[in-house]
Amino acid sequence: MAQVMDFKVADLSLAEAGRHQIRLAEYEMPGLMQLRKEFADEQPLKGARIAGSIHMTVQTAVLIETLTALGAEVRWASCNIFSTQDEAAAAIVVGSGTVEEPAGVPVFAWKGESLEEYWWCINQIFSWGDELPNMILDDGGDATMAVIRGREYEQAGLVPPAEANDSDEYIAFLGMLREVLAAEPGKWGKIAEAVKGVTEETTTGVHRLYHFAEEGVLPFPAMNVNDAVTKSKFDNKYGTRHSLIDGINRATDMLMGGKNVLVCGYGDVGKGCAEAFDGQGARVKVTEADPINALQALMDGYSVVTVDEAIEDADIVITATGNKDIISFEQMLKMKDHALLGNIGHFDNEIDMHSLLHRDDVTRTTIKPQVDEFTFSTGRSIIVLSEGRLLNLGNATGHPSFVMSNSFADQTIAQIELFQNEGQYENEVYRLPKVLDEKVARIHVEALGGQLTELTKEQAEYIGVDVAGPFKPEHYRY
């Protein structure tokens, strides 16, 4: 166990309110609740010490308590400075104890962290006293990056200085590593050796994992949870379809019907965005670099354009690419007066927030938390949500519980798979086995009252599958 019950959250007095919300979410998260029942006696995560970094929401609270119910010890931070629901964080810290004597899980997260505080929190999930974490559960790859780059700079004996074009966040990251190197030399190398595996939640984090693997610096096996079908085709699309509109409504009360909307990117998240706006009666255009995705958008009835072509007429612009430099400062200058700009990709670098926040000829007016008006020297202004970070979590509470039950059941199963099968996986990136993906889907089909058709032995043999599945080959595209 960690030496002390340490934590840092906004307000422990919010714990009771958080507990009520967690109980409600449990009814909408059948995947996690089923896993608790199935593995209660087996305790497959007994001995696991999980460093967790996922948005500290009510749904994540159900995930955390599922991991601990299966035997794990956990320390937790959020993966975004704005996404924490403070009542959920408080409830997890208090656990079965009281506000005066909390007895839950150490959480280091609160809504509205500074960048320096954010990286301090990430460091805390790796600080286990006399022990070391042996599993990582990540969203966006920041926790994994801390271990890999931290070890690299330890070996070099120096954390490099920030460069002129480095983001404020990366500068804060280097500052954290510099402090740790001075105070705890060798920390990251020890952690890299102790960790049995990492499970990664998002597209952005998965890209980082593949990059680390190509570099030859991935020190442990990684499970790509994002590309599990029950994650990418449900969380990314259906979750976004719900939470994007929720975020915009809470932020602005803007009517979307009849508005010109530009969605940048038509992957699974972009598809959810376009469908959401279409359902509200907006006129949707899409930007896309991939010709296959672009063709899908056209066949779905959307115009495919470039940013430069469509930015001047757009009332709402949403980035959903997982890439960087999608909306430049020059393009923002061309936007309609009081047009809305937001991002639903993992990081804030899809929009040139650096220019908005640091240029002398731009004036910032905070309308309310995570809603800012930026006025240009021309007199025109735009409304930016969550400082260019995930608006569905900064301006709302993220995806609904049921869809997160899919994703977090995948995470739990992936943690069990890597933890129990040490030595069977190389230091590479793996997909969640199809049989486990189908298991998660089956639980949720039953929860929604669906009735699955059972193949006869002859039918199964005819298409070359087992009667119980898996029903599709790994390469099948759903």
UniProtKB/Swiss-Prot annotation:
Query: Which SUPFAM superfamilies does the entry link to?
Result: Formate/glycerate dehydrogenase catalytic domain-like, NAD(P)-binding Rossmann-fold domains
Q: Part of which pathway?
A: Amino-acid biosynthesis; L-homocysteine biosynthesis; L-homocysteine from S-adenosyl-L-homocysteine: step 1/1
> What family is this?
Belongs to the adenosylhomocysteinase family.
Claim: Cytoplasm is one of the keywords in the record:
yes
Keyword Metal-binding carried by entry: no
Q: What is its EC number?
A: 3.13.2.1
UniProt protein name: Adenosylhomocysteinase
For this protein, what reaction is catalysed? S-adenosyl-L-homocysteine + H2O = L-homocysteine + adenosine
- Tell me which cofactor or cofactors this protein depends on: NAD(+)
For molecular function, the Gene Ontology terms on record are: adenosylhomocysteinase activity
**Which residues make up the binding site for substrate?**
T57, D139, E201, K231, D235
Q: Which gene encodes it?
A: ahcY
Cite a single GO BP annotation: one-carbon metabolic process
**Which PANTHER family does UniProt cross-reference here?**
ADENOSYLHOMOCYSTEINASE
Which InterPro entries does this UniProt record tie to the protein? Adenosylhomocyst_ase-like_sf (IPR042172), Adenosylhomocysteinase-like (IPR000043), Ado_hCys_hydrolase_NAD-bd (IPR015878), NAD(P)-bd_dom_sf (IPR036291), S-Ado-L-homoCys_hydrolase_CS (IPR020082)
